[in-house]
Regions:
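Substrate-binding pocket helix/loop in short-chain dehydrogenase/reductase
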Residues: 50-52, 58-63, 149
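Catalytic loop of short-chain dehydrogenase/reductase
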Residues: 90-113, 118-127, 139
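Short C-terminal tail/terminal secondary-structure segment
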Residues: 99, 169, 180-194
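The beta1-alpha1 cofactor-binding region of Rossmann-like NAD(H)/NADP(H)-dependent oxidoreductases
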Residues: 13-24, 56, 162-163
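Alpha-helical segment proximal to the catalytic Tyr-Lys
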Residues: 79, 123-127, 177
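A conserved structural motif in NAD(P)-dependent oxidoreductases
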Residues: 153-164, 175
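Active-site loop of short-chain dehydrogenase/reductase
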Residues: 35-37, 81-94, 127-130, 182
Length: 194
């Protein structure tokens, strides 16, 4: 709520995997502002564990936490953006989209699905001036992470949350009007994929 006040925005508490909460978020925002020009989707970390020891329920929970909110929110926001003549959506996922990690198996599996969905969505709705991109952060200082993970970056440090935020703001803005369907890594060189 404090951040919402600072940004002249709104705060709405809910869970991305709860369709009633996402419906209410969009309704609440439209009632307050009358339009939605951009949407940033960032969900928490799904269950982790050894690959074959993760329960079926945890795999389902990961799907509900990571992929389904993107699909649900897209269905809700697209008609609004169509009526407004366009908009921009950014999905925050992870660097492990390009290089899956056994440290984050469910995240690796379902977040690559978000990148695939993003490409399909941009193919379908790009002609209507609705853009969708993914931001793929590396290890960021807002998380409680072991220091040795910072050494994976060529900069030998964690990303600052402000560095991720500036990239997201760019992708949401008209400054990136010709960028859509992309999965953009902001990982400090952690991934080796070209």
């Amino acid at each position: 709520e404090k951040l919402a006040d600072e940004l002249n925005g709104i705060a709405y508490r809910g869970r991305a995997e709860n369709s009633r909460d996402t419906d209410n978020l969009i309704k609440f925002t439209m009632e307050k502002f009358g339009r939605i020009d951009s949407l940033l989707i960032h969900v928490g970390g799904p269950p982790k564990g050894d690959l074959l020891e993760i329960s079926e329920d945890d795999w389902k929970k990961a799907n509900e936490m990571v992929l389904m909110p993107v699909i649900r929110l897209s269905k809700l926001i697209t008609p609004i953006m169509q009526s407004q003549g366009g908009g921009s959506i950014v999905n925050i996922t992870t660097f492990s989209v390009f290089e899956p990690s056994l440290m984050f198996p469910t995240s690796s599996v379902y977040r690559v699905g978000v990148s695939s969905y993003t490409k399909l969505y941009s193919d379908r709705y790009g002609p209507e001036n609705i853009r969708m991109n993914c931001l793929l952060p590396g290890f960021t200082d807002s998380l409680d992470l072991p220091e040795e993970l910072s050494q994976m970056s060529v900069f030998k440090r964690f990303a600052r949350v402000e560095e991720q935020a500036k990239t997201a703001a760019f992708l949401l803005s008209n400054d990136s009007s010709y960028i859509t369907g992309q999965s953009i890594r902001v990982d400090g060189g952690v991934t080796r994929h070209i």
